[in-house]
A protein has these predicted regions:
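Membrane-cytosol interface segments of multi-pass membrane proteins
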Residues: 1-209, 299, 325-365
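Functional transmembrane helices that form membrane-embedded active or gating regions
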Residues: 4-16, 85, 89, 233-245, ...
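Hydrophobic residues within membrane-embedded alpha-helical segments of Major Facilitator Superfamily
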Residues: 19-22, 62-64, 216, 223, ...
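Interfacial loop-to-helix transition and helix-capping segments at the boundaries
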Residues: 48-61, 138-152, 198-217, 232-240, ...
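Transmembrane alpha-helical segments
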Residues: 67, 155, 159, 163, ...
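Hydrophobic, small-residue-rich membrane helices and short re-entrant helix-turn-helix hairpins
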Residues: 79-85, 224-235
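Alpha-helical transmembrane segments of multi-pass integral membrane proteins
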Residues: 98, 244-355
């Protein structure tokens, strides 16, 4: 079954990957322990903290919701067997390759930056044999690093398949129509924050809470079950943007000022989750309204975005390791790191694209 391509989702996915690269580049200049990247400058650029916090608020929710929407489209044009094969080839295989080959190199660069003189061979053995602890990789042990996103998507794809199959087989369901009619009313979609809040109350892996992102992945799928939702997001996009802007201000600037589980802390957490979802709704509405168009540049960017997501963090770390040692203005260092990460990531994609084995392990279509 042929489906109409949603070019706006391609544009938003490309934008989301760029924001991940920007986020990791900003974090090099945020010296607080929670700002986890594998290279650090000696200068703290304080405005970068607010910028990175804002990006972090909505960017991964955007990517997970788009992933759920894309799964809906994928299942319309594939059998269950084809879908599962695609998930193994496009998610599990690249994630496994990256965790085994890319991440040890990246975390070894971190060890060099802190003057750890352990040889690479010895380090590799420790990477796979030490207790992984919190999975950050900071102590020289195993980490999925940024590839946690691919691992989560693979698991979600398997867990949700029975539900998605059941939903797709339900035709002309009156209850489904009534639900879509209700949720498509002005700003009613905001109630979808309730299951996200419930998931967030179960604290697992902090900001990588798999329950929260699973709910967002499911939400993405269900947003594609009725065209009413697309029209509603287009209609309400500016209102969602205003709500998201106000709530994100509260979350970014007041999130850490109150005692955990106090009344004000709970209110700020609610505002934060509302911000995450409403900013994504605004972006989906704006994307469909203004960017649902094909172009040659979009084809290249969309085809390369998965590979660039995989490789950018290693390149960012390697470039950062060199640049932070140069006697340059910190803002200039940041600009150079960001620019070189983008350029070298695209060059890497262009170089490996004709090589069948590398195409496979880097998820190139």
């Amino acid at each position: 079954m042929k489906t109409d391509r949603r070019y706006d989702l391609d544009w938003l996915r490309v934008g989301g990957v760029f924001l991940v690269i920007l986020f990791h580049s900003l974090m090099i200049f945020i010296l607080e322990p929670w700002a986890l990247v594998y290279i650090k400058d000696s200068t703290y650029i304080y405005p970068f903290k607010a910028i990175s916090n804002f990006i972090h608020l909505f960017n991964m929710p955007l990517l997970f919701i788009i992933a759920g929407m894309s799964v809906n489209l994928s299942l319309k044009s594939r059998t269950t067997g084809q879908y599962l094969k695609d998930r193994f080839q496009k998610l599990l295989l690249p994630a496994t390759f990256g965790c085994i080959i890319l991440n040890p190199i990246m975390t070894y660069i971190y060890q060099l930056s802190i003057n750890n003189t352990t040889g690479f061979g010895e380090y590799i053995i420790g990477f796979f044999t030490k207790n992984p602890g919190d999975l950050s990789g900071i102590e020289g042990c195993f980490t999925p690093a940024h590839l946690w996103f691919l691992i989560f998507l693979f698991v979600y794809s398997l867990l949700s398949l029975p539900l998605f199959t059941k939903v797709s087989q339900t035709k002309n369901n009156v209850a489904k129509k009534n639900i879509s009619d209700l949720l498509a009313k002005p700003f009613v979609l905001i109630v979808t924050v309730i299951p996200i809040l419930l998931a967030a109350a179960i604290n697992i892996l902090d900001d990588k809470n798999p329950l929260v992102y699973f709910v967002m992945f499911l939400l993405g799928y269900f947003l594609m079950t009725s065209d009413h939702y697309r029209l509603a997001l287009n209609r309400d996009k500016w209102g969602y943007l205003a709500i998201g802007g106000i709530c994100s201000f509260l979350g970014v600037y007041f999130g850490n000022l109150f005692e955990e589980w106090s009344g004000m802390w709970i209110m700020i957490q609610i505002a934060t989750q509302i911000a995450r979802i409403t900013i994504v709704f605004a972006l989906l509405g704006m994307g469909n309204s203004y960017f649902n168009k094909a172009s040659k540049s979009l084809k290249f960017l969309s085809n390369s975005s998965f590979t660039i997501y995989m490789i950018h963090f290693l390149i960012n770390t390697g470039v950062g390791y060199i640049v932070i040692q140069c006697p340059l203005n910190p803002l200039l260092k940041f600009t150079i790191i960001l620019a070189l990460t983008l350029i070298l990531s695209f060059l890497f994609y262009i170089i490996i694209k004709p090589i069948p084995l590398l195409r496979t392990v880097f998820g190139i279509k």
